[in-house]
């Protein structure tokens, strides 16, 4: 789909974990439709843009793709996201960070790796960072968090409203209120194809 022109920068489209090349068919089009429906001028990818299943620390499917084949397919699929959403703030997720973790495990200097932008051939208008703030709300992937209360616990720790992804089976909003403020923790859904061998 063609990029959405315009949009209110105060309206934020959150793209859930895509885990390319294992994203659910039609998820990109769904996100683009939501962007237009709600006039979203700010786009945030909550992280785990790619899966990196072949280099995961978890057990792998021996009949799955090689690391090179998976990487090339993931990069090809990510180009569709770049074309549809040219300006994105990306929260680096645990799967995005796997190449850096593997370099650390091997005892190699992290400087030997390229940046996320270079690795995934993303446009310069995709801003890669672990945390982004938009209108007083923190957006982070949620690495290391778990359970129904993960996002509201993150909001409590951050002392401000917080949005996370990471938890494929949780999608909720919880609130914390005091005499001084009201903050929320939001866990967004994800765009994975749960039938793919990687899951």
Spans of features found by a protein language model:
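Structural motif
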Residues: 4, 35, 154-155
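Residue-level preference for short coil/turn positions at secondary-structure junctions
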Residues: 7-9, 39, 84, 135, ...
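Core catalytic region of metal-dependent phosphoesterases/phosphodiesterases
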Residues: 11, 15-122
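General small-molecule cofactor/ligand-binding pocket signal
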Residues: 13, 89, 123-128, 140, ...
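Conserved beta-sheet core of the metallophosphoesterase superfamily
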Residues: 136-199
């Amino acid at each position: 789909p063609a990029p959405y022109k315009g949009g209110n920068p105060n309206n934020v489209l959150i793209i859930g974990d895509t885990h390319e090349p294992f994203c659910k068919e039609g998820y990109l089009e769904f996100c683009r439709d939501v962007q237009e429906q709600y006039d979203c001028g700010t786009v945030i990818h909550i992280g785990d843009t790619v899966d990196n299943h072949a280099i995961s620390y978890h057990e792998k499917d021996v009949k799955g793709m090689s690391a090179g084949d998976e990487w090339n397919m993931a990069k090809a699929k990510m180009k569709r996201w770049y074309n549809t959403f040219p300006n994105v703030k990306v929260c680096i997720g645990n799967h995005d960070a796997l190449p850096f973790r593997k370099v650390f495990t091997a005892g190699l200097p992290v400087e030997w790796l390229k940046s996320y932008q270079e690795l995934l051939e993303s446009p310069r208008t995709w801003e890669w960072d672990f945390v982004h703030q938009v209108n007083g709300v923190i957006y982070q992937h949620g690495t290391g968090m778990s359970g129904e209360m993960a996002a509201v616990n993150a909001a409590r720790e951050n002392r401000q409203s917080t949005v996370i992804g990471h938890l494929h089976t949780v999608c909720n909003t919880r609130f914390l209120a005091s005499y001084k403020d009201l903050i929320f923790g939001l866990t967004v859904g994800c765009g994975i194809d749960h039938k793919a061998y990687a899951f």
